[in-house]
């Protein structure tokens, strides 16, 4: 007796917004035919806080504590772009020592961000062992941050014209010790992960993006460099003092999840090289120049004058943003983080447009997961590396 064939019904599954592998409050509406993904629709906005509108009602210094809540795992970069925008707009020069300190902090933050990507990414694939080794090294970076800035996260360390405080005594030696130790840690990760046959089965050939597709979708960072495009803003559009260091852009041509993993692991080693060179070359001198500039404006001010000590020092240094516009960008761990700033001869920005790398990189997700298996969604989403704080803003 033959049973009549019935048409299979498609299944619609909600993944998130409270799924442990969603890396934040991301919701995916997935249409399945058995285990095969037919369609995927990301739903964003659960973490929208109006960051661009808040900026239009604050001075830059007042706004600085807010920006660490975009990408809260790489806060040095959000601070850097926030102070770079008015510095470029008003042509404010920063001391060489402050620029070197910024580079050191940015590269430490890049390593911490990549580590915090790698640990959960491996856990998503079912590999729990590397997670604990990775967080061991990340803890050392946070100890360095705490010693220099007073905070493990949300540092609020960068200032217009420099940084908030100089490096404490003995900090540079501890940082060099960490660099030597961490290079051995990267080798350990590669031995544990890179040649693991189960890991390779899960990531090799999964989530392929060609170089042309990557450019057309506006991807940046490791997503772009893993598809054969050697584009790193630290090389092609140098900022701070990156043009004074010798390092190589990490890239792969395969364009799959494995290539994105290899790019990020390679970047951690290159970041250590940059930090070591910056520490070796770091000059003496002031760590910020804004107080000196404000002091010189007052003809009759004295260093021990009442007005300078109590009225000039305590409030935020305010200055008007001239009627100009510019776009400034940095190479964040997840890609190109940019700010489009429009001044209006007032203390507040007239327009503060954020270009978050995670939001733009996430747009290609539905195309990548179609015709893949349900289990591959976590691999592909993890390889993109998103933080919903900067995606939703």
Swiss-Prot record:
Annotated Gene3D superfamilies: Cytochrome-c3 Hydrogenase, chain B
Q: How does it assemble?
A: NDH is composed of at least 16 different subunits, 5 of which are encoded in the nucleus.
By sequence similarity, the record places it as follows:
Belongs to the complex I 49 kDa subunit family.
Q: In which compartments does the protein localize? A: Plastid, Chloroplast thylakoid membrane
Q: What class of enzyme is it?
A: translocase
User: What name goes with this protein?
Assistant: NAD(P)H-quinone oxidoreductase subunit H, chloroplastic
List the membrane topology term(s). Peripheral membrane protein
Name of the gene this protein is made from: ndhH
Its main subcellular localisation, reduced to a broad class, is plastid
Q: Which GO terms describe its cellular component?
A: chloroplast thylakoid membrane
Question: What domain of life is recorded for the organism?
Answer: Eukaryota
Q: Per the record, what are the reactions this protein catalyses?
A: a plastoquinone + NADH + (n+1) H(+)(in) = a plastoquinol + NAD(+) + n H(+)(out); a plastoquinone + NADPH + (n+1) H(+)(in) = a plastoquinol + NADP(+) + n H(+)(out)
What's the EC number here? 7.1.1.-
In Pfam terms, one family for this protein is Complex1_49kDa
Q: Which UniProt keywords apply?
A: Chloroplast, Membrane, NAD, NADP, Plastid, Plastoquinone, Quinone, Thylakoid, Translocase, Transport
Role this protein plays: NDH shuttles electrons from NAD(P)H:plastoquinone, via FMN and iron-sulfur (Fe-S) centers, to quinones in the photosynthetic chain and possibly in a chloroplast respiratory chain. The immediate electron acceptor for the enzyme in this species is believed to be plastoquinone. Couples the redox reaction to proton translocation, and thus conserves the redox energy in a proton gradient.
**Record keyword Thylakoid present:** yes
What biological-process GO terms show up in the record?
photosynthesis, light reaction
Q: Which molecular function term from Gene Ontology is one that the record holds?
A: quinone binding
